[in-house]
């Protein structure tokens, strides 16, 4: 199910950003210009991340899955960003604590049922250290999914 929402123009490998806002601004330019979302999606993501952080500390690596603002999604998508240098984001399980995120999956879905199904599959996928290692190496995302 995940493959059908992942597009080549939304895969960003070995990128450098100073922080989450810098990353979000860059990815949003692509999402808006390619008609995946309306510009308001950015504000919705920032707000949601403040209230309900999406950073997950797993076994030896950290991942974030920012999502939200379904009313601004024009075309359902999953965007993958691997980072040259980790960025600080707050933890999902302890919002007051930050962690260094290596990989980010930004997702946008117009329907909550699709959103929940894909989020569940993504959560299962990211718990496999081999998958994360392959993504960091730049292995084809579609072969990993």
Question: Where are each of the predicted segments found?
Answer:
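Cytosolic covalent-transfer regions centered on His/Cys nucleophiles
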Residues: 1-145
């Amino acid at each position: 199910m995940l493959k059908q929402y992942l597009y080549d123009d939304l895969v960003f490998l070995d990128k450098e950003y100073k922080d989450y806002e810098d990353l979000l601004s860059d990815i949003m330019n692509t999402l808006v210009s390619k008609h995946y979302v309306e510009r308001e999606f950015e504000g919705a993501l920032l707000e949601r991340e403040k209230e309900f952080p999406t950073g997950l500390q797993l076994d030896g690596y950290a991942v974030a899955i920012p999502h939200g603002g379904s009313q601004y999604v024009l075309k359902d998508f999953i965007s993958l960003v691997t980072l040259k240098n980790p960025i600080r984001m707050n933890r999902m399980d302890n919002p007051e604590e930050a962690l260094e995120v290596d990989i980010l999956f930004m997702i946008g879905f117009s329907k909550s049922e699709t959103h929940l199904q894909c989020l569940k599959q993504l959560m299962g996928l990211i718990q496999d250290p081999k998958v994360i290692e392959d993504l960091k190496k730049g292995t084809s995302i579609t072969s990993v999914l």
